[in-house]
């Protein structure tokens, strides 16, 4: 499975592509950070991100995109810009019929380091080890994009099993409700014929 990991942001947007192998084997194919100047109009910044993502999607043809879920209890403007960048990326994926999955920062940290409260240095160190990179990916947005892709590769089988189980439970619920409805209707008809 080829996964594009995205650490969305207006000033720096981390992009990565990794390929999963057997078990937990993952191979880094590419990583970069798209930068947009803070002083430029929002629409132009989003367009620059969109153009870069379009190029990456056309070049790397990922099977799925993993985007960091926006979370911020500090700066609403930062959270809004991050969400807007993530939306541009999700839209580009939807136009190509590529699945998009969102992962929280704590899910990513837990998947990569075993600790959902790991700091950026710990995440970067583990990403470097997991992917057997010669040097640490910089800036942190690049490491975060790789961590998102790794997280998705490792969580995807579980997510697939959970989705299948939820679908099976929903189907059983529908059948059970149909049976109850049929029994109620039969009981009502039986009473009306007496």
UniProtKB/Swiss-Prot annotation:
Binding site for Mg(2+) 1: 7, 141
Domain of life: Bacteria
CC annotations in GO: cytoplasm; Holliday junction resolvase complex
Top EC class, one word: hydrolase
Keyword Hydrolase: yes
CDD domains reported for this sequence: RuvC
UniProt-annotated location(s): Cytoplasm
Needed cofactors: Mg(2+)
Catalytic activity: Endonucleolytic cleavage at a junction such as a reciprocal single-stranded crossover between two homologous DNA duplexes (Holliday junction)
Active site (catalytic residues): 7, 68, 141
Keyword list, A-Z: Cytoplasm, DNA damage, DNA recombination, DNA repair, DNA-binding, Endonuclease, Hydrolase, Magnesium, Metal-binding, Nuclease
BP-aspect Gene Ontology terms: DNA recombination; DNA repair
EC number: 3.1.21.10
Cross-referenced Pfam families: RuvC
PANTHER family xrefs: CROSSOVER JUNCTION ENDODEOXYRIBONUCLEASE RUVC
Entry function: The RuvA-RuvB-RuvC complex processes Holliday junction (HJ) DNA during genetic recombination and DNA repair. Endonuclease that resolves HJ intermediates. Cleaves cruciform DNA by making single-stranded nicks across the HJ at symmetrical positions within the homologous arms, yielding a 5'-phosphate and a 3'-hydroxyl group; requires a central core of homology in the junction. The consensus cleavage sequence is 5'-(A/T)TT(C/G)-3'. Cleavage occurs on the 3'-side of the TT dinucleotide at the point of strand exchange.
Similarity comment text for this entry: Belongs to the RuvC family.
Protein name in the entry: Crossover junction endodeoxyribonuclease RuvC
Organism: Mycolicibacterium vanbaalenii (strain DSM 7251 / JCM 13017 / BCRC 16820 / KCTC 9966 / NRRL B-24157 / PYR-1)
Gene for this chain: ruvC
